[in-house]
UniProtKB/Swiss-Prot annotation:
GO biological process: maturation of SSU-rRNA
Gene: rbfA
Quaternary structure and interacting proteins, as annotated: Monomer. Binds 30S ribosomal subunits, but not 50S ribosomal subunits or 70S ribosomes.
Gene Ontology MF term list: ribosomal small subunit binding
Record protein name field: Ribosome-binding factor A
A Gene Ontology cellular-component term: cytosol
Pfam families: RBFA (PF02033)
SUPFAM superfamilies documented for this protein: Ribosome-binding factor A, RbfA (SSF89919)
Gene source species: Chlamydia abortus (strain DSM 27085 / S26/3) (Chlamydophila abortus)
Role description: One of several proteins that assist in the late maturation steps of the functional core of the 30S ribosomal subunit. Associates with free 30S ribosomal subunits (but not with 30S subunits that are part of 70S ribosomes or polysomes). Required for efficient processing of 16S rRNA. May interact with the 5'-terminal helix region of 16S rRNA.
Length: 120
């Protein structure tokens, strides 16, 4: 139980530290002019690797380019974030795109169809 609580706490600290580094320190042109939100961090049980999930706005065609730029900058981001989170071993971070808007869009489309059917 305490191990689970510890991982949750470290996940939260990492999410905040990585988000701050992306916002303030990364100067990559495909990253700095995008609205990037670190939605969650999933740390491995041995604390040596972390999956960092991000949502990127504008989302249409630029999200894959921005994700690739984040992956290319992962070591720098980890280095800067390690200054704010003190751990014996700072985890290797891997970025993944979290598409949080697709379920919303799907529900909105369903509601739109229902409204159209009610009118007819």
């Amino acid at each position: 139980m305490t191990e689970n609580r510890r991982i949750k706490k470290v996940n939260s600290l990492l999410r905040e530290a990585i988000a701050n580094v992306i916002l303030k320190d990364v100067k990559h042109p495909k990253i700095s002019n995008r609205w990037i939100t670190v939605t969650r961090v999933c740390l491995s049980k041995d604390l040596h690797s972390a999956r960092v999930y991000v949502s990127i706005m504008p989302h249409e065609n630029t999200s894959t380019e921005t994700l690739e730029a984040l992956k290319a900058s992962a070591r720098y981001i980890a280095y800067k974030a390690s200054k704010g989170v003190v751990l014996k071993y700072f985890p290797e971070i891997n970025f993944y795109l979290e598409d949080i808007f697709s379920p919303q869009d799907h529900i909105e489309n369903l509601l739109w169809k229902i409204r159209e059917q009610d009118k007819n």
